Structures are given as C-alpha cells and as structure tokens.
Regions:
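Amphipathic alpha-helical and helix-coil boundary elements used as assembly
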Residues: 1-233
Length: 233
C-alpha cells in the first residue's frame, strides 16, 4: 500500500466523527490473542469524559484517497487524557475486540456431555460475542465432563481451544466494518495472502502491499505435552 494519499479516521459511537482526528495509532495482533489497538486522537471537544468513550463501539478506517482499504472494529476499553494546548484536547484510547471482555470474569462450573462448539457458544454469548465463525474441518466429540475452576472465561476458552488444536483470529470484512471472531482447527480456514514483496522504503512505498521490516528471533519452547485424565463421578 502506497503512503501517498493515506489517511486514517476513527468513528466512536455517540461522538461526531468530524470532531476528532487520528494523530497516531498502533495495532498489536497475533493468532489466539485478542488484539489491542492504541489510538491517539485530537479533538476540539474539551468536555469529553470517560463515560463518552468507555464501552462504546469504535471503528478505525484506513483510507487510500477516498477508498477505504481496511477496517478495525472493537470497543473502547481504556481512555486517558493527553495534552490540552488551548485549541485541541488529546485523548489516548485502547480498543479491543468483544472477546477481551471474557477475561474480566472468573467462574467455577462443570460442563457435561457437551462438545467444544456448544461450550464455546455458551461462553462467547455470555461475553457479548453475538456472532462468531466455527471453522471446523475435523470432528470434535462431546466431552464427558469439563471443569472451569477459578479461571477467567477467556483463560478457560483458550485452554480448551488449545487442547482441541484450535486457534482464533478476527476476520475483517473488506466491504465494510463487519468483523467476526473466527475459531479454526486447520490452516485451510485462513485466507491466502498471496506473495508479498520486500520494500524497506517506507517513505515512498509502492502501490501494493509489501513487507517493510522483518526480524529473526529464536527461543526455547516446550517440545512435548503430557495429559492425564482423572475419574469423575
């Protein structure tokens, strides 16, 4: 994507879109971890409070000229006040997907004779994730029993998904800000990115998507996993 004509807008529910301007943003996104979008905005509205931002839906749009290139949708989970220079107020926002809310609650409960799709649907619905995409290519039989013991709903879900060989990500719409949580058990559920070229020039850029920076990293990780079942009555 060329830097020429590139601009960014942020729409926050309940706040007039033209009253804010995106100063900078950073998006941290990985498989099987809820993303975090940090946005620094400037506004001529000096009297905005935390209640005007928190829990409100927000959409960051990346534009190339007058054409939207990408949307990132979520809700505002954190807000802090920045500098007031007399004519603009700065606000720093943290935006996360609805799944992130599942990490705010801990619970003790037992699920019996339910498969991973049913258990996931229950917890996701409780977290406010109304729509999600179970992209399952393999059978996932019902479990005799499954215990959530003092874990957060998010910790419990991610543990179960890891045990079932599942990973998750946010699938963004290309034609609009529609965005859904996708839970997948095979790379066949991923959209191919095609071939990406390498272009270290971030000032001029090119007309297509490319990699501008990469790093090599190595670390020690577990090489095997042992599991053990216990009798439940």
């Amino acid at each position: 994507m060329s830097a020429e004509g590139l601009r960014f807008t942020l729409k926050v529910e309940g706040i007039q879109e033209m009253s804010t301007a995106v100063v900078s943003f950073s998006l941290h996104q990985k498989y099987s971890i809820p993303f975090t979008l940090e946005v620094d905005i400037a506004s001529g509205l000096f009297d905005l409070t935390a209640e005007d931002f928190l829990e409100k839906n927000a959409v960051l749009t990346v534009w190339q000229g007058d054409t939207p290139q990408r949307y990132v949708s979520g809700f505002v989970s954190e807000v802090s006040l920045g500098v007031n220079n007399g004519w603009q107020m700065r606000y720093q926002l943290s935006i996360r997907p609805p799944l992130w809310r599942a990490g705010l609650r801990q619970n003790f409960r037992i699920f019996q004779q339910q498969d991973i799709r049913t258990i996931s649907a229950t917890l996701l619905n409780e977290a406010g994730v109304a729509e999600w995409m179970p992209l399952f290519y393999e059978a996932h039989p019902a479990r005799e029993f499954c215990v959530q013991y003092g874990e957060s709903d998010l910790g419990f879900l991610t543990r179960l998904w890891a045990e079932e060989g599942l990973f998750f990500f946010e699938r963004c719409g290309k034609a609009g800000p529609e965005q859904k949580l996708a839970v997948c058990d095979d790379v066949a559920g991923l959209t191919s990115a095609g071939t990406l070229g390498f272009n270290p020039d971030t000032t001029g850029g090119g007309t297509t998507e490319h990699i501008s920076d990469f790093r090599y990293r190595a670390e020690v990780r577990p090489s095997s996993v042992d599991t053990q079942d216990y009798t439940f009555k």
